[in-house]
Amino acid sequence: CIKCGQCVQVCPVEAIKLADLADGYGIGVPHIEARTQACDFSCDGLQCVLACPTGALTHSLNYPAETRMGFARLAQPDSCLAIQGKGFTGQARGPDFTGTLRYEEIDRWNPISVADHPYDLELCDLCMRQCPIEIRIAQCEAGTPPSGDANQCPPRHAIVFESIGSGKAMMPVISDGCVGCGVCEMICPVNPTVIVIDIDKSADTVMAQGN
């Protein structure tokens, strides 16, 4: 990485930032703070990878399911609304949250403000509902893969819900299809967030370790 900022310029949701002195990554290093603005793969074609002039972002990657940005984990499971069997109504992060997502049922190409998209859920499933990998799997199962390209179909789930007991409570379970995009962390309505991204891990390393 030569800190050129090309990836920052092409990101459609402005998820990539150049680190400042206080961020702890090294001045000018591109990074994503998922809780503030996650990567939702709005571009489909991984524009940050295509824009990178040096190969610091691996040019062999062509599709979202191939990326490895980190791995999600439940950091505060006792606070999870789904585990408590609770629903959620309202703006996921409140009226002042500035993060954006691409809601394909509203606009295929243009991300909109999360604050402008309230929810009314009998059981909170926002982490799975908005997961870009799970959205793509659902599209592919319906016979409508993203951009009409079957290669965009993820081979594995990123997050699934498993029943807890006999009630409606559900446990979010991170699967080996997780790419660490951070949408689950960004959209979680609980503060502090229930789910976080470990940027020093990936699906490959976690599954190899059996953790």
PLM regions and their residue ranges:
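Conserved catalytic residues of ABC-type ATPase nucleotide-binding domains
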Residues: 2
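Iron-sulfur cluster-binding cysteine motifs and their immediate structural context
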Residues: 6-23, 43-65, 88-104, 119-120, ...
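Gly/Gly-Pro-rich "capping" loops immediately C-terminal to redox-active cysteine motifs
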Residues: 21-38, 70-73, 150
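Beta-strand initiation motifs
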Residues: 25-26, 67-69, 167-168, 205-206
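Flexible gly/pro/ser-rich segments immediately N-terminal to CXXCH heme-c attachment motifs
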Residues: 29-43, 75-76, 80, 113-122, ...
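Flexible internal linker/loop segments at domain or repeat junctions
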Residues: 68-111
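Long, non-transmembrane cytosolic or organellar matrix-exposed soluble domains/tails
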Residues: 85, 107-113, 152, 169, ...
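Extracytoplasmic/periplasmic copper-protein system
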Residues: 199, 204-211
